[in-house]
Amino acid sequence: MRTRWRDHDWHLVHDAPQAPVLHMALDEALTDAVASGRRPPTLRIWEWAAPAVVIGRFQSLRNEVDMAAARRHGIEVVRRISGGGAMFIEPGNTITYSIYAPASLVEGLSFQESYALMDAWVLDALGELGIRAWYQPLNDIASDAGKIGGAAQTRRGGAVLHHVTMAYDIDAAKMLEVLRIGREKLSDKGTTSAAKRVDPLRSQTGLPREQVIERMLASFRRLHGLAGDRLRDGELAQARKLVRDKFGAAPWLADVP
């Protein structure tokens, strides 16, 4: 039977910055922990310890990323367990969160319907910030001024992982160096047009990143309830093992299933 948001006791994890590869592993570890009942349903706000490109589970590394440019800029390239497109991440310029929920929350819903459900609270928060934002199928959060963020989702073992990366600010020139975004189609104005396609929250709100996050959390708490929490030692240990055995290994990054 399908459950509702308020049927669950939601917990918040907002810890210190972590390495990009550890974030990938934490997503798997926490999804599995919720699936098994070892952890309550959780909202996790990510803090990044380093710049990164995160590619989707089914993307080709060669087609998506200029690895020479990534190395030149000191950007770590990692692969996540969910589908979707490549994300360009810089600490301080990005707001990323994951929701780890029992699969019952999205039972009977299509992926499109579940994206809309899982993004509704953040659209409410953006509205409180004066931004008219909407869900644009399949996985974008958009506004009149341009794209704000992108979502990805996977379902595994009785749980659903839904995560979103939103641009607080953006270095469009660097992004275009590292990501292969239709380079053959880009004119000399490519950087300008790419920047227009993404309209960051900083320019739309005028607020510091921390205040945007605080307003987001206030909306989630008001709508669904939210209790403070932290990563447990066992969860971190499991994530570090996943880094060694999977996410930090070359085959995972290079492999396309």
Ranges and model annotations:
Residues 1-68, 72, 80, 182, ...:
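Active-site loop/lid in soluble adenylation, ligation, and acyl-transfer enzymes
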Residues 67, 87-222, 244-257:
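Catalytic beta-strand/loop module used to bind and position nucleotide/cofactor moieties
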